[in-house]
């Protein structure tokens, strides 16, 4: 099979193009919202509410949306969610015109945007398998991820520089990008698979089985919960507008660069891991990576130099990539095939929404103790979690090879 096999139809380029456009628009918009809301309210709590407004619908809708994506055409679900995101960009534009000094209308639109994400992410995950045969899936996933990583790196920087032209220009660009993304998604071809409907009780029983599986496997539970609490405590992304404006004095352009820095570290680390994968002492590497994430977060909080702050954010992204690589590998090896969908839904529900909940925690802590102490305390909290999890989950700490997580055959 040649390297170009997965590109022989228009569907894969259209699918990837749709994902790149929606990812870019989301990240550009997040930079604009963060700067605009903080500019209006001048309190870190306002930035925490930005995360909370998205977290509640995202957390509530992830599992139902995943089940819905199995019963209806995921292309329709994805296109509809992206149209909803485009509507949100239009509403942000309207709020900027009609209510330029009040954040409350923006919070309502953010909740709608979180609901749209709750539907778009499960649909995106399920759609690729509809578009390519099994033998082309691995290459399609690899190419999709590489281009999305480019979007994650470039999106915040583009958002910061776009915002120098004003929020109206930024939201207008996002609206157009979401509409184009929806058009590409709606035009996708591919294979349809009818999974059939099931009773509500049966769906929730399947979800409960996934939760029980995670709870009963120390390696899986430890890996998922370690990542969850590290992001909750150590994430500083929500407070970057405060640092850009009041600490480092670099404006919205600098904010975009700060937001891109973790993705740069993650991308470089992903390239390194692809060439030199972790083969031994996987558990030790996992805990060291999370500890490094916490330490770099503390150093970022204490920094007053823009370039040192960039380096520390790159380190957090690199450490997070190592953690994600090991966690995903351990969970995949530990989970038998019949349980993969349910375990994946559970981990996505808790880890996928933890960024927004972590944003709220950061905003609350900063409102109580100040921005810099909040970041330092969060990084220190991550180190405490690492020490506690080493004692609570010794099987995770002692994992050598990633394949050691494979359950024994009885």
Task: Describe every region a protein language model picked out.
Residues 103-110, 114, 136-195, 253, ...:
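Hydrophobic alpha-helical transmembrane segments
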Residues 38, 128-133, 138, 245, ...:
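Helix-terminus/helix-capping segments at the ends of transmembrane helices and short amphipathic helices
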Residues 20, 101-119, 228, 296, ...:
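Hydrophobic core of transmembrane alpha-helices in multi-pass small-molecule transporters
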Residues 136, 186-212, 399-406:
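Flexible cytoplasmic inter-helical loops of multi-pass small-molecule transporters
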Residues 22-23, 54, 113, 144-151, ...:
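Structural signature of transmembrane alpha-helices in multi-pass secondary transporters
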Residues 50, 60-64, 71, 75-77, ...:
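C-terminal transmembrane bundle of multi-pass solute transporters/carriers
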Residues 2-57, 212-262:
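Helix-loop boundary and gating motifs at the non-cytosolic
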Residues 33, 119-132, 322-335:
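Intracellular juxtamembrane helix-capping segments at the cytosolic ends
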């Amino acid at each position: 099979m040649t390297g170009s096999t997965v590109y022989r139809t228009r569907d894969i380029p259209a699918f990837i193009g749709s994902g790149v456009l929606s990812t870019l628009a989301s990240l550009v918009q997040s930079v604009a919202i963060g700067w605009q809301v903080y500019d209006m309210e001048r309190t870190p709590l306002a930035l925490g509410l930005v995360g909370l407004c998205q977290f509640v619908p995202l957390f509530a809708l992830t599992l139902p949306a995943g089940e819905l994506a199995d019963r209806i055409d995921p292309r329709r679900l994805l296109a509809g969610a992206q149209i909803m995101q485009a509507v949100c960009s239009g509403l942000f534009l309207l709020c900027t015109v009609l209510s330029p000094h009040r954040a409350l209308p923006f919070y309502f639109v953010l909740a709608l945007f979180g609901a749209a994400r709750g539907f778009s992410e499960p649909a995106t995950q399920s759609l690729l398998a509809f578009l390519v045969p099994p033998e082309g899936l691995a290459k399609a996933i690899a190419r999709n991820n590489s281009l999305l990583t480019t979007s994650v790196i470039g999106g915040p920087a583009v958002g910061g520089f776009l915002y120098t032209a004003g929020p109206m220009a930024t939201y207008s660009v996002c609206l157009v990008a979401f509409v184009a993304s929806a058009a590409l998604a709606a035009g996708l071809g591919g294979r349809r698979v009818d999974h059939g409907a099931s009773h509500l009780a049966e769906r929730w029983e399947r979800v409960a089985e996934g939760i029980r599986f995670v709870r009963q496997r120390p390696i899986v539970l430890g890996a998922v919960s370690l990542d969850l609490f590290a992001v909750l405590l150590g994430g500083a992304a929500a407070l970057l507008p405060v640092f850009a404006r009041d600490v480092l004095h670099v404006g919205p352009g600098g904010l975009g660069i700060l937001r891109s820095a973790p993705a740069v570290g993650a991308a470089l680390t992903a390239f390194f891991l692809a060439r030199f994968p972790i083969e031994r002492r996987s558990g030790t590497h996992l805990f060291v990576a999370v500890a490094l994430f916490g330490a770099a977060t503390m150093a970022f909080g204490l920094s007053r130099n823009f370039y040192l702050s960039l380096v520390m954010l790159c380190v957090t992204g690199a450490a997070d990539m190592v953690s994600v690589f090991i966690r995903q590998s351990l969970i995949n090896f530990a989970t038998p095939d019949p349980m993969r969908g349910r375990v994946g839904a559970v981990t996505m529900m808790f880890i996928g929404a933890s960024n927004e909940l972590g944003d709220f925690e950061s905003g609350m802590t900063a409102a109580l103790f100040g921005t810099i102490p909040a970041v330092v305390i969060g990084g220190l909290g991550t180190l405490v979690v690492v020490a506690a999890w080493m004692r609570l989950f010794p099987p995770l700490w002692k994992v050598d090879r990633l394949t050691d997580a494979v359950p024994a055959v009885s």
